């Protein structure tokens, strides 16, 4: 049962009619995308905060129509109809609502709580209609405030709760951002329980929580050392199909260590292996602290079923078994490195290369096609797919734009051709790799030079060049080609921007690790292909219970990667 807070008036007998009515709405209607219980209370809410709504406000402020005037529209056009599009746009931008939005955005950027509250009070005095956006920015700015003390009172927190109440009174429909900012307010007041209540209430409004929605409650409970409540929030996340990231898992790891819950530490390490793979320095240090702790020394079994462990490793694809802590006694914990073959320089154990399920690859290719068709001109991408079926498969796909610019001030066809030749040399079929280039690079600039034009014609005649159409993002093309051909992808692109985040953290990092080839160019060695490592750079758990944890680095070509090796001093 939810606690009765200022954010849960619907659970009080003295609640406002708005929330009381919502409890009577059948669930089949409550979650319908077109149903909104607020319509019966505020007919203009359907366009509240939208461009249409702002137009309505401008027109009402300029022309207070009556029925007779409206009936006379046939004989004379209203002044608003004579306004140019530019004038209408200017009127919208200068409306009280738009000006308030601009000023609140500036307060949000600067974290200026006092100015935001002053603007809010002024807007209410002047009768400015606040939209969902206005309220969300106000709540966000108030949530930035730190907890008040006797010597330093903070008006942002107390006023934030009042603003939330006023939003409900004004019958403004809340969204995910509203509840998330409310949760942040609660945590700023040192009340993670209230923050968790906010997340629970989202379902009553048909709102799907996001990862950021859970952060205030989860981190709040972890800071307080309330492990049970933190696990409850985590379970709610799993139920809502919200996937945690490293900060959330690190917080759960810390609270599990502090409460000496070895089973939870083990499960969290497995989740870090699955979802994060390589950990940041702070998490790396925390894991090192665990293996050096007395609790870790005393945790584990002396005997285990070797066949069961081995079968679990095989069924999991290699690199882990998930059967719990193996062995007893003190851990030998060292920071180390791997050699080029994946052999630990500390314990001499060779790390494994974790398999990729072929079914996963096919599913990923289908997902990639769907995403590309949503963001590219579908006909263009389908045309590329048909071309690839006729000319493929290839042993390697080259991100031409990236390869021509590595360590170069301007695009270099010489370097791109050098990359093509190196890839052809290592190809089992000795076939030319597929070069993906934007049409602008194929038709203009250095491409017009006779030598480069001849090179492009050679690739084109061999069916090894594809020019992506104007306005397209060539990233979709070279990535799809490499995935569908199950071949190497030659690019120094780290693939971390928004486009690649759409692909998720489950399969794509594993695929990239096994298929991406990067180049390095030096005066001494010239151009060198850096092949995928023969082992997986991911947290690994051996059949004897030994752990190897990799630290994430920006560029492991330039910086050697540190690993944590944790092995029992005594083995059965």
From Swiss-Prot:
Stated name of the protein:
Proteinaceous RNase P 1, chloroplastic/mitochondrial
* Biological processes annotated in GO: tRNA 5'-leader removal; tRNA processing
Q: How is the cofactor bound?
A: Binds 2 Mg(2+) or Mg(2+) ions per subunit.
Observed phenotype of the null mutant = Embryo lethality when homozygous.
Where does it localize? Mitochondrion; Plastid, Chloroplast
Q: Which cofactor(s) does the record list?
A: Mg(2+); Mn(2+)
What changing residue 399 to N does, per the record, is:
Abolishes ribonuclease activity
Please state the protein's primary subcellular location: mitochondrion
GO cellular component terms, alphabetically, are: chloroplast; mitochondrion
Q: Which organism is it from?
A: Arabidopsis thaliana (Mouse-ear cress)
So where does Mn(2+) 2 get bound? Answer: 475, 493
Query: Catalyses which reaction?
Result: Endonucleolytic cleavage of RNA, removing 5'-extranucleotides from tRNA precursor
Its EC number(s): 3.1.26.5
A GO molecular function term, named singly, is: metal ion binding
Keywords of the record: Chloroplast, Hydrolase, Magnesium, Manganese, Metal-binding, Mitochondrion, Nuclease, Plastid, Repeat, Transit peptide, tRNA processing, Zinc
State the similarity comment. Belongs to the PPR family. P subfamily.
What positions does the entry give for Zn(2+) binding?
344, 347, 548, 565
Residues of the transit peptide: 1-70
Per the record, what is the consequence of mutating residue 475 to N? Abolishes ribonuclease activity
Which residue ranges contain the repeat PPR? 96-130, 136-174, 175-209, 210-244
Q: Which PROSITE patterns match?
A: PPR
Q: Where is the PRORP domain?
A: 338-565
Q: Specify which residues bind Mn(2+) 1 according to the UniProt entry for this protein.
A: 399, 474
Physiological role? Endonuclease RNase P responsible for the 5' maturation of tRNA precursors. Preferentially cleaves at the unusual cleavage site, but also able to cleave at the classical cleavage site. Also involved in the maturation of mRNAs in mitochondria.
